[in-house]
Structure formats: structure tokens, C-alpha cells
Amino acid sequence: MNAPVGGIWLWLPLLLTWLSPEVSSSWWYMKATGGSSRVMCDNVPGLVSRQRQLCHRHPDVMRAIGLGVAEWTAECQHQFRQHRWNCNTLDRDHSLFGRVLLRSSRESAFVYAISSAGVVFAVTRACSQGELKSCSCDPKKKGTAKDSKGTFDWGGCSDNIDYGIKFARAFVDAKERKGKDARALMNVHNNRAGRKAVKRFLKQECKCHGVSGSCTLRTCWLAMADFRKTGDYLWRRYNGAIQVVMNQDGTGFTVANKRFKKPTKNDLVYFENSPDYCIRDRDAGSLGTAGRVCNLTSRGMDSCEVMCCGRGYDTSRVTRMTKCECKFHWCCAVRCQDCLEALDVHTCKAPKSADWAAPT
């Protein structure tokens, strides 16, 4: 039966346009682009004009961002190491992750958040290390202040996280056509959640001065925590991500399931359910789990039952060198021997009749 004019079939092309990004954030490809700043700025595909302007104007910041890509991708892979999709990257793809992030899924939400957080972390750290011309330590942390332990003096080098957040917002969000399509709004929201996550773990560190370290005087500064804390926090947000739909005027979100609360600025949001990532699917960007190592004794996501999607697994015996027969020698060393250890490794079987990828 034909739908009436103004019905769902009329809205479907517009909905698909809203949900389909042109490409993923191609600035991620800066990790693989070396050479001078001009070479880097002109050869990263897909940068919008504002991003290229910032790239040419702040080549030292771009180098910091490029180095930071390796750090946040490693963190992404750590968090997803026991899952079917393991945040694998494609070296020859300028989107870095391939087609998997074209879907507005939980995984896309996490990657946008962790990448935005990675820019904040990398830029802020470079500021504190004196590597950037446009910033240094936080200039606002001067003079005397108070906390629950009393009065202290600001000293040392407080991480200038406000600069890191400001630059990350200007550079990363520049690609998103804010207010024009659903995916751009989703990306902007998750980018902001990532930036806020880094600041959440900014901590005050102090050094005591006085007789025998009596803390008669204290000098304090603000420092970012290890990036793993941000990764762990965003992982929890990934597991609690909220599915949303566009509101009627196309300017914001509403929850897809009315039983759930409205997302806060700290929550990750997504539109589409994830594929199961069990088999290789070029359209979905999934490499499948054939050849992936699984844990025979686990009951979690890395178990052979879950990881292999019920297809079964192959077992092979391998040997590895380990330290053994360790003894303590006075004083003060532990000396060990090198021993060969045999262990069983379990890997997921391939689908019986499917084109499957090499181990991921």
C-alpha cells in the first residue's frame, strides 16, 4: 500500500541523509602523515577550511595532535581488547577505522569521545612541556589559595587544560556541520563528553616545605591524571550509552526509549544499533572474529562462546619463554632462569561458507 504524501516514505531519504556522514574524522589520519607542517596540512584528506587554517597557523600543535593519535587509538584498543570489534585501525584508510564508523553506533560514539579527549590531553601536555608557542602553564594558577587542608601557594606548572579544551573544540568540531544533520550533532555531543572527561580527572598535587617535611608551607599545582583514567571512564559511559532520536525541529535529541533519562553532557549518545561483528562484512566495516584469540575459561565477552559467535574454535599448542625458578639474593636482587612454557591457544573458527578476513 502506498504511503500518503508526507508519510514515512517521504521522510526516509531525509532521515538517511541525516544519519549518513560523508566520511569519518579524517584528521585522525595525521598519525600517518609526516614531513613539514605544510606537507601535513595539505595532504590530510577531508580537512575543512577552518581545520587547514588552524593547521597552517599552529604547526607545533598539529605535531602534538598527530603524536597523540597513537596514544588514544592504543587506549581504544585496550578498552575493546576483549570484544568482537577491537578498535582495529586500517593504515591505508584516511578515516583510520574504515566503514565501521559510518554507522551511528555506540562504537562511533566512543571513538569520537576518546579521540576528542586525546586531543585535549596531547595539546595540554605539550603546553606544560614548553613545546608550543601559543601556550604554556596555566597562567591563572598564581598567588595564594585555600583548600580543605588550609592555605597554599600556587607553584610549579599547572596543566593548562582550558587551552587544550579550547583548541580541541575549535579544531575537532570544525568538521561537524552543527545543527544541519543528526550525525554532526551526535559527533559534537560525544566530542564534548570526551573533552569533559579529561578535565574530570584533573587533580591537585602538592609539595610540602618545612622542618622534616612538616608542611608548614605547601606549593601546589594542577595535573592531568594518566590517560587510562579517561579511557576507563569513557568505557563506562560506552556501556551506559543512551540511544536517541532527533527531535521534531532537528536541533537536538530525545531518548529513543522513554523509560530512560535524558542524556547529560557527560553521556555518550548514539542513533543506530551495532552489528554483531561476527563475520566479515565490507558494508558494515566488520572484519569478523575468525582467527581471533579467545579465552576458553572466561564467561565474559572474550569467551570462546561469545567471541566466536557459536562457530567453535581451533586449539594449537605454542611455546613461549618465561622467567622461572626465581631466587632472592642478598642484597638486593632477584635472579631467574629462562624456561620454555607450553600452552594452548584457542582461535575462532571461520564461517563455513564465507569470505573471512585474516586475524584482527
UniProtKB/Swiss-Prot annotation:
SMART domains according to UniProt: WNT1 (SM00097)
Family annotation (InterPro entries): Wnt, Wnt2, Wnt_C, Wnt_CS
Cell compartments where the protein resides: Secreted, Extracellular space, Extracellular matrix
Any single biological process term in GO: positive regulation of transcription by RNA polymerase II
Superkingdom, natural source: Eukaryota
Post-translational modification: Palmitoleoylation is required for efficient binding to frizzled receptors. Depalmitoleoylation leads to Wnt signaling pathway inhibition.
Gene Ontology CC terms, in alphabetical order: cytoplasm; extracellular space
Annotated keywords: Developmental protein, Disulfide bond, Extracellular matrix, Glycoprotein, Lipoprotein, Secreted, Signal, Wnt signaling pathway
Gene Ontology molecular functions: cytokine activity; frizzled binding
Lipidation feature positions (O-palmitoleoyl serine): 212
UniProt cross-references to Pfam families, sorted A to Z: wnt (PF00110)
Glycosylation sites: 295
Disulfide bond annotation, renumbered to this chain: 76-87, 127-135, 137-157, 206-220, 208-215, 278-309, 294-304, 308-348, 324-339, 326-336, 331-332
Entries under Gene3D superfamilies matching the protein: 3.30.2460.20
Signal sequence range: 1-25
Known role: Ligand for members of the frizzled family of seven transmembrane receptors. Probable developmental protein. May be a signaling molecule which affects the development of discrete regions of tissues. Is likely to signal over only few cell diameters.
UniProt family annotation: Belongs to the Wnt family.
PANTHER family: PROTEIN WNT-2, WNT RELATED
This protein's name: Protein Wnt-2
